[in-house]
Amino acid sequence: MKQYFYLFNYPPEEYDLCALEFKYLFHEEYQQCFITNKDIDVNISVFMKGKIDIWAISSNFDDLKEEVKRQNHNHQDFKVIYLKNPISHPDYQETLDKCKDISWFIAGSVNMSKPKPTLALTKVNDLWIIGYYHHGVPSWKKYDDKPNTFSNSLDIRLARTLINIAGENDQTKTMIDPCCGMG
């Protein structure tokens, strides 16, 4: 079964809002680093920093390399990054070495400036994780600029979070904004 790693980030004053949104998206108690089999678009949440479509997980880095080698990945113009997280803090040089080390087990060519795809490596609670990386680039962010400085409308981060809570990640639901155009 396919698994996904999610990393959340929030300002301290928005912890409760982030935890509530997390509960409605995943139907679980909040965790800042979370592994699940639910595939949720990273762009729908203001709090999702990143997502990894997991290829392999292992407590031993050498075993992780062997699993990546066994899967026989081949990518042109890929890049391996280390995804920082608040739980584990390997030394910076170690993260560079690990990214370089695992990239030898991926066939293809490396492109550091314009990669496609970006692969992420991270370590959480003594578990090494690698896979495709998705960084949130929310399309709704373009609405962050209010039409006027005196606008009464909700902050876009709050509005997006309320939509996620109300919709519970059900993409088939249609919602109507009763104040549409209030601006």
Stretches with model-predicted labels:
Residues 1-112:
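Non-catalytic nucleic-acid substrate-recognition regions in nucleic-acid-modifying enzymes
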Residues 78, 119, 128:
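A broad, low-specificity signal marking well-ordered, structured residues that form hydrophobic/aromatic
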Residues 93, 115, 152-156:
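Short, amphipathic alpha-helical segments
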Residues 108-110, 119-120, 164-166:
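A generic local secondary-structure boundary/capping motif
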Residues 111-116, 141-145:
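Class I S-adenosyl-L-methionine
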Residues 122-124:
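Short beta-strand micro-motifs enriched in acidic
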Residues 127-169:
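SAM-dependent Rossmann-like transferase core, predominantly class I methyltransferases
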Residues 171-181:
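Conserved class I S-adenosyl-L-methionine
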